[in-house]
């Protein structure tokens, strides 16, 4: 009987036999020999590389979501796990953030270094040029200066947009010319646009024309490899691909429309992103393996995990709005570049098994329709040796079935891969004693020494004589009414001050003599001050209504509104129209202040003087005892922490570091001048958390991230990744690190902890 085996030695003996039969080794990809010219074509069955059909597993790894010294570690682990292709976007707004005349390719924006490493580790690349990327990345990857081009309409048959897109794509192709496969580089696929088919109808006939123009223009660049356009079912001259949690049922309609195109899955959403105020989404590994196996059974030949490694939204790169700094995504490699078990090891085994039977798959056409053994149980057979038996039923009772004179037990929502009557892989099987949710973040420990050497502090209002709230640095704009925030900040800061001088009238007070401020429309978050004294906060989409308390009940005061973005929209049509800041009316009582003459200023003073790079020029207030009572504990306070690094491990392959910000509230962090990102200790209030479901291997039925989450009633994020090369600032003789924090509300920096985790490979 071919019953499910728990004996892994037997499983690997069977796999070895399959390998010998096919004359292949499991790690078969010798794809990028030095200076080898790679010929890439395709037909309806698969991609063909140098004349050989390929079954390909791809992993999304975005180069700017980790530090450049982590790239080799992440890529090596990916290769060892059976990944064939690295999938990455080009992020336009990190390479040209402020103007079309600048180019930035340093640090973790060094795309050529990343591609060199891909080739070094024998990995192909799918380069998704876009230029729209989505990716939960701020503004979908668009540089904000595009908004200033008159009459531009993004992603439309619009001359201004097409001019800018052409210039950027031509530059990218020329800049990366040596990295395309015909020139000996690792890039074997390229993508133009991104998921445009989901929004195309919102652009009408112009959308259709733009989609056609996009691929025609891309092909005119003559890069010598196939172009893809994901979720684009009206274009024949690019390979249309699928994105989603399950894509097996997309294949038949795809081949009906494009019989000469292979079936590629460019985004198997292996988890999901997390918003501030939400609990952590988890996707069961059994469901991922099930979706993979079904896709291959139906004829798919390329699967990309989105994400294979998620990493971190450093700086202000997270999109949304409201997306947290971590982009862990519950990926097989966690935010810190380490295996997320059991997702990593089971995915690796799946790749090894499928690579071993590649020729049996690709040298046979998929069956036109499956064979049904019973309700919910179907078989896809390839030749005489290989079968995929699927139970897509959701009853929790296993089924006993007969196939090819053998008896098998199959679990619900699972696939058995059978070779020569033996089970090579069961997508539902979890080895005994498996630890779930076993990843780096759950194994951090505080460094057992008093590493905070000193704490300094200064209020943003005290950083120059003009004070905060819109005065002081000459970068202010006056207007009768508030101006949309992005026009002021040019997205160089989350923060924008709106200030006006108020003289109250009888209309300002309610019947109890109180003053209430109302802002009818704003995005995303506001802090309210009167004469530099904090009054309260609000965040959209709620109406801002709060009581004001002028100092000494003064009838004249300066009203200061600090507006904040928390990541710019990354998925929408007509993003050229995107606006932030104060967009509605502003009233105190029934006194309308909207046209009261406003002063607007981009950024905090500390940001504008780059306090995180010039901390030695600041007249900091020292807190000798570093006790809570000696701290300012007021909104908009900058803190400087000197942290001892003496005796700490510096081996990037064996240790990872993070900051525990549980004692703080909301703000931003810099370590040695590197922006770690936003922090916010907002609690996850989502009511559906399924820690017990995860521990009990519950995976049956279609996955929905909204009801499969953990860590309710905890902060959405309290642990913040600090790359080791940033912590030691590329100089391992450093004895300390400098941490700069802007705390918007209040907190105790004395209780910030540096955490470490020693990696056991």
Curated annotation (Swiss-Prot):
Matches recorded under InterPro entries: BetaGal_gal-bd, Galactose-bd-like_sf, Gly_Hdrlase_35_cat, Glyco_hydro_35_CS, Glycoside_Hdrlase_35, Glycoside_hydrolase_SF
Protein known as: Probable beta-galactosidase 2
Biological process according to GO: galactose catabolic process
Family: Belongs to the glycosyl hydrolase 35 family.
Superkingdom in the source lineage: Eukaryota
Described function: Cleaves beta-linked terminal galactosyl residues from gangliosides, glycoproteins, and glycosaminoglycans.
Keywords, alphabetical: Glycoprotein, Glycosidase, Hydrolase, Signal
Signal peptide coordinates: 1-23
Pfam families in the record: BetaGal_gal-bd, Glyco_hydro_35
Species: Dictyostelium discoideum
Protein EC: 3.2.1.23
Gene Ontology MF term list: beta-galactosidase activity
Taxon lineage: Eukaryota, Amoebozoa, Evosea, Eumycetozoa, Dictyostelia
């Amino acid at each position: 009987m071919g019953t499910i085996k728990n004996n892994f030695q037997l499983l690997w003996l069977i796999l070895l036999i399959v390998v010998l039969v096919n004359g292949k080794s499991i790690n078969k990809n010798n794809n990028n020999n030095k200076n080898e010219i790679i010929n890439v074509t395709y037909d309806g069955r698969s991609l063909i590389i140098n004349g050989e059909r390929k079954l390909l597993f791809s992993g999304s790894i975005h180069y700017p979501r980790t530090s450049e010294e982590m790239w080799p570690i992440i890529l090596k682990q990916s290769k060892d796990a059976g990944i064939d292709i690295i999938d990455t976007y080009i992020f336009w707004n990190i390479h040209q953030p402020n103007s079309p005349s600048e180019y930035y390719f340093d640090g973790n924006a060094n795309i050529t270094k990343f591609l060199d490493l891909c080739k070094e580790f024998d990995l192909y690349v799918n380069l998704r040029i876009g230029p729209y990327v989505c990716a939960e990345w701020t503004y979908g990857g668009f540089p904000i200066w595009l908004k200033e081009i008159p009459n531009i309409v993004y992603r439309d048959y619009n001359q201004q947009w097409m001019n800018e897109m052409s210039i950027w794509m031509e530059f990218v192709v020329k800049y990366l010319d040596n990295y395309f496969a015909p020139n000996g580089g690792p890039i074997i696929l390229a993508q133009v646009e991104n998921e445009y088919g989901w929004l195309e109808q919102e652009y009408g006939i112009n959308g259709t024309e733009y989609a056609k123009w996009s691929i025609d223009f891309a092909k005119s660049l003559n890069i010598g490899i196939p172009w893809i356009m994901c979720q684009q079912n009206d274009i024949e001259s690019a390979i249309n691909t699928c994105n989603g949690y399950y894509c097996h049922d997309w294949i038949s309609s795809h081949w009906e429309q494009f019989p000469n195109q292979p079936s590629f899955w460019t985004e198997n959403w292996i988890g999901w992103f997390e918003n501030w105020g939400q609990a952590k989404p988890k996707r069961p590994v059994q469901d991922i393996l099930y979706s993979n196996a079904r896709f291959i059974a139906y004829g798919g030949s390329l699967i990309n995990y989105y994400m294979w490694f998620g990493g971190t939204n450093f700086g202000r790169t997270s999109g949304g709005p409201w997306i947290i700094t971590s982009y862990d995504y519950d990926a097989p490699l966690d935010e810190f570049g380490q295996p997320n078990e059991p997702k990593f090891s089971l995915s690796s085994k799946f790749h090894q098994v499928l690579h071993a039977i590649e020729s049996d798959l690709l040298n046979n056409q998929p069956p036109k329709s499956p064979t049904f053994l019973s309700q919910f149980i179907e078989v896809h057979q390839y030749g005489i040796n290989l079968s995929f038996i699927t139970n897509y039923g959701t009853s929790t009772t296993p089924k006993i079935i007969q196939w090819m004179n053998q008896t098998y037990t199959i679990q619900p929502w699972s696939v058995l891969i059978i070779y020569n009557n033996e089970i090579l892989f069961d997508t539902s099987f979890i080895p005994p004693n498996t630890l779930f949710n076993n990843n780096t973040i759950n194994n951090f420990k505080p460094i057992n020494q008093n590493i905070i050497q000193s704490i300094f502090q200064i209020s943003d209002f005290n950083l120059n004589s003009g004070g905060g709230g819109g005065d002081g640095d000459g970068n202010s704009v006056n207007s009768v009414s508030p101006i949309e925030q992005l026009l002021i900040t040019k997205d160089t800061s989350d923060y924008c001050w709106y200030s006006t001088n108020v003289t109250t009238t009888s209309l300002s007070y309610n019947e109890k003599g109180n003053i209430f401020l109302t802002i009818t429309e704003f995005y995303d978050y506001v802090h309210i001050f009167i004469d530099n004294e904090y009054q309260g906060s609000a965040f959209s989409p709620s109406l801002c209504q709060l009581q004001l308390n002028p100092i000494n009940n003064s009838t004249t005061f300066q009203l200061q509104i600090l507006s904040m973005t928390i990541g710019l929209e990354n998925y929408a049509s007509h993003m050229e129209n995107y606006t932030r800041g104060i967009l509605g009316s502003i009233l105190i009582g029934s006194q309308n202040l909207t046209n009261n003459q406003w002063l607007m200023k981009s950024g905090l003073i500390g940001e504008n003087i780059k306090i995180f790079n010039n901390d030695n020029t600041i007249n900091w207030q020292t807190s000798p005892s570093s006790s809570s009572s000696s701290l300012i504990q007021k909104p908009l306070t900058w803190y400087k922490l000197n942290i001892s690094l003496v005796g700490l491990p510096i081996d990037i392959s064996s240790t990872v570091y993070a900051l525990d910000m549980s004692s703080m509230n909301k703000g931003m962090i810099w370590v040695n001048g590197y922006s770690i990102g936003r922090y916010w200790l907002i609690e996850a209030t989502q009511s559906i958390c399924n820690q017990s479901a995860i521990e009990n291997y519950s995976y049956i039925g279609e996955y929905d991230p909204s009801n499969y989450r953990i860590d309710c009633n905890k902060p959405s994020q309290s642990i913040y990744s600090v790359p080791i090369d940033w912590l030691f600032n590329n100089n391992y003789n450093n004895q300390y690190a400098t941490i700069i924090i802007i705390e918007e509300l209040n907190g105790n920096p004395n209780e910030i902890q540096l955490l470490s985790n020693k990696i056991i490979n």
